Amino acid sequence: DLRMSRGLGDVYKRQADDRTIFVGANNSGKTSAMDCLILFFRDKKSFTTQDFTLSNWREINKIGNDYIVYSKESDLDENKLSISAWQPFVPQLDVWINVEENEIHYVNRIIPTLDWASGKLGIRLRFEPKDIKTLYTDYTTAKSTIEELTKDRSKKATKLWPIHLWDFLQKKLHTYFTVNAYILDPSKFGQGDTPQLLSEDNIPIDFDPFQGLVKIDIINAQRGFSDPNTPETGISNLSSQLREYYSKHINPTETIDATDLDALEAIEEANKAFDIRLEAGFSSSLDELRNLNYPGFGNPEISISTKVSPVDGLKHDSAVLFNVQKGETDEQCLRLSEKYNGLGYQNLISMIFKLIRFRDEWMKVGKIAKNSTHEIEPLHIILVEEPEAHLHAQVQQVFIRKAYDVLRNHARLKEKKDFCTQLIISTHSSHIAHECDFKSLRYFKRNITQNQIPTSTVINLSKTFGAEDETTKFAKRYLKTTHCDLFFADAAILIEGQAERMLLPFFINQEFPKLASAYISLLEIGGSHAHRLRPLIDDLGIITLIITDIDSVDPNAHRRSVRPEKGKNYVTNSSTLKQWTPAKESIEELVDLASTKKQSSNGLVRVAYQYGTKITFKNKVVTVYPYTFEEALVFDNIDLFKSMKGDGLIKKYSEALNESTIKECLRKMFEACLLYTSDAADE
């Protein structure tokens, strides 16, 4: 659970069993969550004031103002300098792990109580003041100095440091702040969404609680801009990685054993042969030096000795070759060096090999085992930030399918439970989301607030997709067979037919330029099935427009489709209108419903359907009630469609508009709609 960091509010990220995927729209907090995990686990010294939830600095500055007030009191009550004042506003991370009885030796230094035997064990990492009294004294002294400098000036002085507590800490954050670790009470695990409070009596532990327990590895996105994260956590080409792998796991000159003797003998023979060749090649040059009486008497004789290092053989562009065409012999095989291969494939190979390196370093494969004195950590966490930054769309799905299997491809891993691997990926790729079990998705939802700095919370979609009812099955099938960009959209439009799918993007581009610049997911739901996506839409909290047909039927005539009319007791057959919003069935009510009544109670979902429209027909103003989206479009553009030449539905609409009476016009249009709807269903 991550709390109060960057643009995040309270983030509850229950990890999936093997891999967890962070999804969400742009600027929803995915990268902030990944970076904060890196800060807490790996780069504690890299915290900045920007890593606090920005809206909390108002409250932190109030703490600074209180300190100024306290400093003017004659007798300071030190109880006012309490860590509890800071607790709600500083970044913190709660880590919960499940410990079996046979694993207690890994956690013997962080056991919460004497009677704890196994089960949940929690650690809170909190970035907080080291010593509040020191912070109080130094801050109030700095402010007092500024007051003394400016109090006699007749004009307002230039703003001097520190303006407020944030300004003070921007320069000296790590002088006064550190990451402390606390043991949590396992009996309070899962009691609501509010993190358990720590009392003033809770004392931080004075060691790294995760040393020997968790191994962390990272692949950053490397966006090409100045990246605050360490550069070595990105990807490099395969040649560079092979050199690093060789040095750690293979190098025969390190911690020599019997298997290295043949290699060392070959290196020695190569050194001798090279020495002889160099001595012969440089002999005339060295003789010239001797004729200068140098080295001379008492000076050392010059000789040449080489040292062949196998890893040097990997320090060139063609260290890694790809066979592009096989030959009858090895010499006839056509090869290209790594840099001439496709960039997407290069990056895929490099990223997969980096995962292999992470796994083998964790499992201490090869020489690294002899150079290490500590046990293998039982938990391996790999953080991969936006792999699509390196990979083309075609290989993104290959990566996500293979990544976890690669991390477990070791004799001590596979399906065994002794060591656990947790792969955490942040992504903005619908291709990657498509390949994942939706239960592994964690959706970052931007909170919609007015006059406040925006924050995000995280929705655990394992609850949304965990059930096996028909609604959930439909949502899974629909997203799998179409696309998953709903998880990354700023808003969604749910439509029913092909006409809407073709025309809506055109309408948006022509009439709504602001919408055109937003990331809107257009989802075509065949028939009136939009309501089946309601649980997902509600959980995502995404702004949604549903365009549906009113679909009027006569309940007294075997629910036969009829043209919408008032006073006939007709009802809608649309499940969206009946079960979602506005949750009404009567056509009489629906066609007269106020616009404000066509949205959900939280204002995030709005439904649009046909209603009464005044048109001029044969010089008379009449009110008509369209049956479909297409009909409504025609009635809004009568002159255009009346003269339009075409086939099929367009021809039928044109003929209907040229009828002599409105009654006959509506009859023919309705027949055309029914025929079109039937043909579309058959297709």
Region spans (language model):
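Phosphate-binding glycine-rich loops of NTP-binding sites
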Residues: 19-62, 341-358, 397, 401-402, ...
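C-terminal lobe/lid and adjacent interdomain/linker elements of RecA-like ASCE P-loop ATPase modules
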Residues: 398-492, 499-513, 539, 560-578
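Flexible phosphate/Mg2+-sensing switch loops adjacent to catalytic phosphate-binding sites
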Residues: 42-74, 359-377, 409-420, 451, ...
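Glycine-rich phosphate-binding loops of NTPases
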Residues: 51, 55-57, 62, 67-92, ...
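Extended helical coiled-coil dimerization/tether regions that scaffold
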Residues: 221-384, 405, 409-411
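Phosphate-binding P-loop
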Residues: 13-17, 374-376
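Acidic, Mg2+-coordinating catalytic modules of nucleic-acid enzymes
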Residues: 208, 476-494, 498-683
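Conserved small/polar residues in nucleotide/adenosyl-binding loops
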Residues: 2, 7-15, 676-682
